[in-house]
């Protein structure tokens, strides 16, 4: 069929004076990978190797060299020339990009970018973004110019400055709610320092977005939100914005563990929502920023050593007992070496015997398992990572779709996995669903219905002697982060009587 199509393509190209190009359908890298690819197709289609009706390829789908392509298409040299022409036009580019911060809608009565462009000069911005929070010069001119460039130039700085000022307003409003109208010098200095770091690293928009969906979850969607976890708990600004419920000043937590200008990296705030409400928060975010601007992150499941053996053995119909025997020969770890099939074979004599076995099915199982080990076996969706983009996601990265397990609807998924996404500059937010929060929420409702008491979990005292007795006895089954046998044992040894960090 392909031959017939090719002949017609050549005919039409000449008839209508259209340039013809030649391509090669590539599914694997080298010619010797053809048989391994054949077995991979059997796995993906659920067929056995000896099934006459299974999907078959020509085994010519390796990435051919220039010489091989010239030989295959020797009868249409003009198509080869046209292909080279396209190749010469392909532009090399890097996917690495500065952070692509989503646009947070700031009320116009607070200020606009246009107003900021009129009232601020580039010199004003240069000084503000390259000096410390007290206006002191802290870097030479070359380093200062490099920093302005890294932030996206003055065109971006006007937006960052507007977001930073609005963030400061929200932070100080929140600080008065947390600490009272008259802020202590310590609180003022801490907030001033943190806001300056957030601004000069280019991240005020990030905090505006996070506080926005957290406050929407709490006050609009009736979703329980965790008090905060990880290094974000060290931020007083996050505490004032309602992102966290832990006072870092009271507990002497370090902000520098969270954001540090000497270690340029995107902020990473893990936000816990109750299991039942997480989906509602994601829907709210999608509706606010647009379906084309919000995507989940793909995950790639690869074939581990034992799985590669089992999969190849299955399609080749190696007896299950023999497949199990091979898998049991794989050690859990190897001394001073990475655990993979070639290293395991070098370490285990029985695997060496299987590799040269007179039984061709056994021998081929080892041979092709070695080739397929580490290959992508399936794809999934990151449990909590979600991208919110300034533009349509497709403007920046390739996407696919996946089924939402909760709603059954299609959702966008990036084709780059998490380790690559940060390099592209896309902003990842972590929306975690926590069963513990659902249980606490249900308990509070049960107390309200049975006792008539309206309980605020954020105001529960942390100095209750009866609670500490439970912890000291290790009676923490079902308690988040304290339910493992090891933690219960440690609590019995520690005998905690107070909470201090």
Annotate each language-model stretch with its function.
Residues 1-501:
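Alpha-helical scaffold/interaction cores of sigma-54-like transcription cofactors
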């Amino acid at each position: 069929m392909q031959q017939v199509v090719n002949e017609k393509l050549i005919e039409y190209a000449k008839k209508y004076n259209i340039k013809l190009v030649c391509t090669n359908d590539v599914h694997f890298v080298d010619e010797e990978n053809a048989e391994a690819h054949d077995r991979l197709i059997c796995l993906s289609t659920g067929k056995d190797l000896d099934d006459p009706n299974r999907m078959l390829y020509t085994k010519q789908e390796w990435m051919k060299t220039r010489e091989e392509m010239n030989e295959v298409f020797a009868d249409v040299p003009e198509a080869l020339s046209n292909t080279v022409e396209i190749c010469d036009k392909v532009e090399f580019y890097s996917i690495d990009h500065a952070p692509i911060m989503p646009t947070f809608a700031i009320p116009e009565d607070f200020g606009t970018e246009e107003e900021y462009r009129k009232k601020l000069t580039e010199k004003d911005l240069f000084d503000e973004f390259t000096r410390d929070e007290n206006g002191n010069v802290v870097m030479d001119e070359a380093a200062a110019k490099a920093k302005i460039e890294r932030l996206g130039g003055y065109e971006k700085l006007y937006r960052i400055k507007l977001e930073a000022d609005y963030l400061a307003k929200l932070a100080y409003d929140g600080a008065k709610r947390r600490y009272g109208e008259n802020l202590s010098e310590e609180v003022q200095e801490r907030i001033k320092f943190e806001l300056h770091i957030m601004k000069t690293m280019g991240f005020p928009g990030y905090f505006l977005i996070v506080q926005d969906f957290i406050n929407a979850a709490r006050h609009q969607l009736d979703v329980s939100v965790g008090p905060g976890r990880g290094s974000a708990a060290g931020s007083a600004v996050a505490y004032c914005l309602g992102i966290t419920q832990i006072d870092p000043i009271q507990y002497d937590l370090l902000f520098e563990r969270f954001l540090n200008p000497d270690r340029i990296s995107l902020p990473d705030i893990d936000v816990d929502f109750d299991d039942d409400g997480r989906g509602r928060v994601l829907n709210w975010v999608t509706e606010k920023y647009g379906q084309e601007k919000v995507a989940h992150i793909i995950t790639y499941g690869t074939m581990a050593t034992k799985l590669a053996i089992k999969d190849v053995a299955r399609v080749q119909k190696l007896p299950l007992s023999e497949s199990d025997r091979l898998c049991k020969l794989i050690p859990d770890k190897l001394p001073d070496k990475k655990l993979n099939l070639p290293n395991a074979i070098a370490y285990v004599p029985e695997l060496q015997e299987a590799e040269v076995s007179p039984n061709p099915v056994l021998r081929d199982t080892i041979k092709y398992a070695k080739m397929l080990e580490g290959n992508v076996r399936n794809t999934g969706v990151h449990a909590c990572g979600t991208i919110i983009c300034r533009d349509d996601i497709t403007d920046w990265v390739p996407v696919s779709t996946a089924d939402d397990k909760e709603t059954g609807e299609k959702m966008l998924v990036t084709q780059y996995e998490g380790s690559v996404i940060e390099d592209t500059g896309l902003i990842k937010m972590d929306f975690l669903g926590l069963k513990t929060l659902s249980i606490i929420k249900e308990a509070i409702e049960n107390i309200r219905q049975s006792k008539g008491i309206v309980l605020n979990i954020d105001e529960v005292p942390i100095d209750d002697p009866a609670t500490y007795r439970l912890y000291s006895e290790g009676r923490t089954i079902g308690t988040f982060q304290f339910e493992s046998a090891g933690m219960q044992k440690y609590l019995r040894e520690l005998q905690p009587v107070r909470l201090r960090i």
